[in-house]
């Protein structure tokens, strides 16, 4: 599974530059911090209204992410794989972070085998490069069904939990 896909060489070079801006020079250095150009007094009124009163109605987690990160900018990893979970790099006050978020707009944000694998891999990657992890949780649970059970949803879910437990970087869950 490719983490990124682009159409042109120019897009590829820009994507690589963007990705490298979130990462340290090596795994022994801390995650990079840049000068924050976002308005410290910025208010995102959309965040007060984005989650519907009806808990069965979905909302777009991308709007939440855009509303909370510096300048609304982030770089998503594996965007076309396991769309029920979002993995991306962003910044808070200039500090590079990895964000993992359930996407209620796709399969209600449930955890299935692929989402668990995607998130676990991202947690391990962030931990390997000292990138703090922010998790935005709105999950109804694991996807039920014989296909998931025979495929090992419990095993893959446990691997996700184990990746979080093993990670030594700062972790915040909202």
What are these regions (language model features)?
Residues 1-174:
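Ligand-binding clefts of soluble mixed alpha/beta catalytic domains
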């Amino acid at each position: 599974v490719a983490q990124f896909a682009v159409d042109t060489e120019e897009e590829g070079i820009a994507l690589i530059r963007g990705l490298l801006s979130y990462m340290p020079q090596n795994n022994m250095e801390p995650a990079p911090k840049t000068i924050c150009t976002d308005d410290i007094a910025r208010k995102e009124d959309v965040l007060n209204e984005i989650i519907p009163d009806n808990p069965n109605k979905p909302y777009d987690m991308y709007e939440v992410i855009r509303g909370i990160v510096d300048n609304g900018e982030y770089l998503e990893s594996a965007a076309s794989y396991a769309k029920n979970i979002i993995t991306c790099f962003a910044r808070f006050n200039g500090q590079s972070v990895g964000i993992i978020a359930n996407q209620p707009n796709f399969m209600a944000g449930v955890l299935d085998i692929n989402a668990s694998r995607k998130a676990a891999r991202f947690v391990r990657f962030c931990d390997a490069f000292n990138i703090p992890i922010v998790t935005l949780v709105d999950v109804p649970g694991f996807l039920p069904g014989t296909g998931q059970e025979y495929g090992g949803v419990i095993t893959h879910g446990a691997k996700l939990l184990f990746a979080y437990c093993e990670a030594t970087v700062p972790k915040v869950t909202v």
